[in-house]
Amino acid sequence: MDTVLEEFDRYLELERGRSEHTRRAYLGDLRSLFAFLDERSPGTGLGGLTLPMLRSWLAAHAAAGTARSTLARRTSSVKTFTAWAVRRGLIGDDPASRLQVPKARRTLPSVLRQDQARDALEAAESGAQQGDPLAVRDRLVVEMLYATGIRVSELCGLDVDDVDTSRRLLRVLGKGNKQRTVPYGEPAHAALTAWLHEGRPALATADSGPALLLGARGKRLDPRQARTVVHQTVSAVGGAPDIGPHGLRHSAATHLLEGGADLRVVQELLGHSSLATTQLYTHVTVARLRAVHDQAHPRA
């Protein structure tokens, strides 16, 4: 199965343009499926993939309390894999063609209030003033994620040449290998300048290549490290929800809309293929308006 998964991974990367994060999730789902298959029908290989077996696998995860959004992704992983396997001649019929994708409940994302975002960014800036290159980098991670609303995988994938410092623009490669240009403001520019002039030169090695953000050993920063940076920074803010990079992305989108930004402009900045995805943030702002109204209006 390992050889098959390696081929499928190459297909996801080269033909579908899937990110490393997505590919890792898909392969993890398939390894879970194959382990389930080996337990139920040892030695059957891909031929053991049937619609009832796939439904049993999903049902086992559902019974274990797996979130509906995760079940939806696992279903998508399997459907993508089996369709590919049919085209490759690895299996005859597609057992997942009639497998229903569970609809994920669309919940309002946790976001920072604007004052909480300011406190988190000020804490990161204060920590960087000592000149430690990792602290300088961490300030840039938090500042740039909030300033631009880009995904953490997009941030960590940036090269130095993807930054136009004169016009304060990022050239971002998003999902499906779609490229977009995203502006950033003066605070992010200050954090970037400090990193390029002080932090990055202190960490760079022969292995750094063109990567903009580096880890402690000089290699390209891993998104998991960036997530840790965000969690640690935000956790120091009193009363703030426990959020990671995606929470900063949610916060940036929400605060843009609260400031009067056009929905389609926010869609372009975030790299959403569907306006419906961006519209989720309008519900956050409406929910906040309702909460303020209920608290402040004498006849609420």
Swiss-Prot record:
Q: Where is the active site?
A: R151, K175, H246, R249, H272, Y281 (o-(3'-phospho-dna)-tyrosine intermediate)
Where is it chiefly localized? Answer: cytoplasm
Q: Which InterPro entries match?
A: CB (IPR044068), DNA_brk_join_enz (IPR011010), Integrase-like_cat_sf (IPR013762), Integrase_catalytic (IPR002104), Integrase_recombinase_N (IPR010998), Integrase_SAM-like_N (IPR004107), Tyrosine_recombinase_XerC/XerD (IPR023009), Tyrosine_recombinase_XerCD (IPR050090)
Q: Which residues form the Core-binding (CB) domain?
A: 1-86
- Cellular location(s): Cytoplasm
Q: Does the keyword Cytoplasm apply?
A: yes
Which molecular function GO terms apply here?
DNA binding; tyrosine-based site-specific recombinase activity
Q: Name one GO cellular component term.
A: cytoplasm
**Biological processes annotated in GO:** cell division; chromosome segregation; DNA transposition
Listed A to Z, the keywords are:
Cell cycle, Cell division, Chromosome partition, Cytoplasm, DNA integration, DNA recombination, DNA-binding
Q: Provide the Tyr recombinase domain boundaries.
A: 107-294
Q: Name one Pfam family in it.
A: Phage_int_SAM_1
Give the family this protein belongs to, as stated in its UniProt record. Belongs to the 'phage' integrase family. XerC subfamily.
Function, as annotated = Site-specific tyrosine recombinase, which acts by catalyzing the cutting and rejoining of the recombining DNA molecules. The XerC-XerD complex is essential to convert dimers of the bacterial chromosome into monomers to permit their segregation at cell division. It also contributes to the segregational stability of plasmids.
How it assembles, according to the record, is:
Forms a cyclic heterotetrameric complex composed of two molecules of XerC and two molecules of XerD.
Q: What is this protein called?
A: Tyrosine recombinase XerC
Gene that produces this protein: xerC
